[in-house]
Each structure stands twice: as C-alpha cells, then as structure tokens.
Swiss-Prot record:
Belongs to the TAF4 family. Residues 63-80 have a biased composition (Polar residues). It comes from the Eukaryota. The keyword Transcription regulation applies. The 1.2 MDa TFIID complex is composed of TATA binding protein (TBP) and the 14 TBP-associated factors. The gene is TAF4. Its main location: nucleus. The keyword Transcription applies. Residues 1-121 are annotated as: Disordered. Residues 81-90 have a biased composition (Low complexity). It is found in: Nucleus. This is Transcription initiation factor TFIID subunit 4. It comes from Kluyveromyces lactis (strain ATCC 8585 / CBS 2359 / DSM 70799 / NBRC 1267 / NRRL Y-1140 / WM37). Residues 170-238 form the Histone-fold domain. One of its GO terms (cellular component) is transcription factor TFIID complex.
Length: 366
C-alpha cells in the first residue's frame, strides 16, 4: 500500500521498531511532555506506515491447510516436500492440457473432409501406366459378357431325356380324366407332362434307393462281438472233426478188406435237398394248382440222392448220422435286390400299394 501523501517518513530505518511502539502516543515520552503539550505539527507515524514497512507474507501455492498445531522441529524438510509435490502436480496439469490440445487438434484435422482433386489422381495413375477409361471399358464388357452367358445357360435344354415318353403320359392321363368325366387334351400342355414324368422318376428313385439300402443291411449284419463267446464250442468242434476223420478211415479200411459193402439208403436226404423240397411245396400250395407232381411227394418213390454219391466210399452208418452233426449251414441270402427288399420298401408307403404288396407276397419264393 502507498504511504500517506501528507506525511513523509524522514527517520532512518533502524528506528522503525520505536515507531511501531509509539504509533498511538501523543507527544514525546523522552522529553516528558504531557498529552496537552504535544506537537501535532511534527511527523508522527501512522498505522499505515507499519503495514508498509512489514515484509509481505508468502502464501502457499497449492497446498492444503495443515491440522497439526504442534511446531515441527525440522521445518525445512516439510517445506521441501510440499514444494516438490506442488511442482509435480503443476507439471501433470500442464501435460494434461497439452495432451487435450493435441487430441483436439487431431480430431479437428480428422473431421475435416479430405479434398482430393480428380485431375491429380488421374495424372498420378497415368504416370503409373494405368488408363482409367480403358479399365472402365474392359469392366463393362466383361459384365455384359457374363450376363449374356448366364441367360444362354438358363435357356439350355436339359441334357438327359425325360423319364417317361410324353405321348404315353398324355394317353394315360386322358384315359383317367375321361373316367372322371373330364375331357381334355394333354398333348398341348408340355409343362404338365414334364411335371408328371419328373414325379414318376422321383418316386421310382426313392423306392429303388430304399430297396438297395435294405438289401445291404440284409446281407451285412452288425458285428456286435468280433471274438468267440466261449472256448468250449471250439474244443467240441475240433473233437467232432477228429472223430469224423477217424470214422471215415475205419470205414474205408473195412471196405478195402471186403468186410463191409458200400450201400446207400434211398430214404436219406441231405438238408439242402429237404430245404429245396419244402420251398417247392410252399410255392405249389400258394399257386393253388395240382398240375405237376413230383416223385418225392408220392409214397414209395425213390429219390435220386446225388449228394450221397459224390461223398465217396462212405458207409450208410456215417451218412445216417448226418456227418457227425458238424455241418454248419449259413443263411441263404441272395445277392442284389430281391422281392423281399422291394416289398419292404413299399410297405413304408401308405397310398396305392395295397394290391401290389398282396400280389408280391403271393409270388414270393422264399
């Protein structure tokens, strides 16, 4: 603050302490003057002079007020710490401001639309050896060519002929329609004829595919257990084979020595012959005709046992035992698709297959 303009301080600086103590006294104490005899004309110190002469107080910059009322012994170290922390905080604030300004400038630069001159771009492409007009013409020609090829491919006639002849389909449909009192010529409607041919083809394809799958499953069963279930059956089979060979050798020796004659019994038939005979009998009963008579159906007739003749010099006793009970017969499964597979495939369909299934089971052979 400025000093009073009316009064000037002419005293030296070393007497400032005395002036502070006598600021509110009227008169001079050293001379023993009374208040009534004080001289107001002399320059007396004022309260404003003391405020000017005092040193200004240093306020903290950014430190929070302390709550510790005790005076610390080492007052120099806390002051250094506070000044260092305040300087670090100020540096961080300045860095944040600078970062914010840089990001703002970058965003502003990115938001600004980039103006590109087409002439400059074309000049750059020409310098690189690229002609824009030629490239555009080539692109348009290729697009037109692909469209033309696609249209021609869509208009092509299918390579394979129809499944059924259109004339036969038309006659069949005309006959069925006339039975329902609906008279129309289907020769002109080629789309309907093609649709009927395709539907018949899909129907037959489905039936044949299912029959093929059923035949494969019929011939190739699922192998649940690849190994043998028991070793006892294997041992018994080996014993039976050894007994059979020993018996055949014994019979051969007896026939060679003339002790036993080679005889065949007409009543003995193999299992294969009996199997065929039973199938023929079943087919004859299903057909319902008695036109053919077989020798094995009449009593007292002798059947030709070809299987026994091909066995060699084996006695009737060995043949009567059925080859010692060791002949294994596998299931007779026909290769390919048979009537059973077709009937099973048709059984899954519910419409228009009743008569076909009945006739099929009547004609089946096994």
């Amino acid at each position: 603050m400025a000093k009073s303009p009316k009064r000037k301080n002419s005293e030296p600086e070393d007497l400032s302490s005395n002036k502070r103590s006598k600021s509110f006294e009227f008169g001079k104490v050293e001379n023993g003057l009374e208040p009534s005899g004080s001289d107001f004309g002399s320059d007396l110190p004022t309260p404003f002079d003391t405020m000017v002469t005092e040193q200004p107080l240093a306020l903290p910059k950014a430190s929070s007020p302390t709550t510790n009322l005790a005076s610390p012994r080492n007052s120099s170290t806390p002051n250094l710490k506070t000044t260092s922390t305040t300087s670090k905080q100020s540096q961080k604030a300045e860095q944040k401001k600078n970062a914010g300004g840089s990001t703002g400038s970058t965003t502003a630069s990115t938001t600004k639309p980039q103006q590109s001159d087409p002439d400059k771009l074309s000049d750059a492409l020409l310098s690189a050896g690229v002609d824009i007009r030629e490239e555009e013409a080539l692109l348009s020609s290729t697009v037109a060519r692909t469209k033309a090829t696609g249209i021609s491919a869509n208009n092509q006639v299918p390579s394979h002929p129809p499944f059924l002849h259109p004339k036969n389909i038309s006659d069949f449909m005309k006959r069925i329609a006339s039975e329902q009192n609906f008279h129309q010529d289907f020769n002109k409607n080629t789309d309907i004829l093609g649709l009927m041919s395709t539907a018949c083809e899909l129907y037959m394809r489905d039936v044949i595919t299912n029959s093929l799958i059923l035949s494969i499953h019929r011939r190739k069963g699922v192998k649940l257990n690849t190994g043998r279930r028991s070793e006892v059956s294997r041992s018994l089979r080996d014993l039976a084979l050894r007994q059979k060979t020993q018996e055949e050798r014994r019979v051969q020796r007896r026939i060679a020595l003339g002790l036993e004659k080679q005889t065949t019994d007409a009543r003995l038939d193999t299992e294969e012959t009996q199997y065929r005979a039973s199938n023929a009998t079943a087919n004859l009963m299903i057909a319902g005709g008695n036109k053919k008579k077989y020798s094995w159906l009449t009593a007292g007739s002798k059947s030709s046992s070809t299987d026994l003749k091909n066995q060699g010099n084996v006695s009737s006793a060995v043949a009567a035992r059925g080859e010692m009970g060791i002949k294994y017969r596998e299931a007779r499964e026909e290769p390919g698709i048979v009537m059973r597979d077709l009937l099973l495939a048709l059984e899954n369909r519910r419409v228009g297959v009743n008569n076909v299934i009945t006739k099929g089971y009547a004609r089946i052979r096994d």
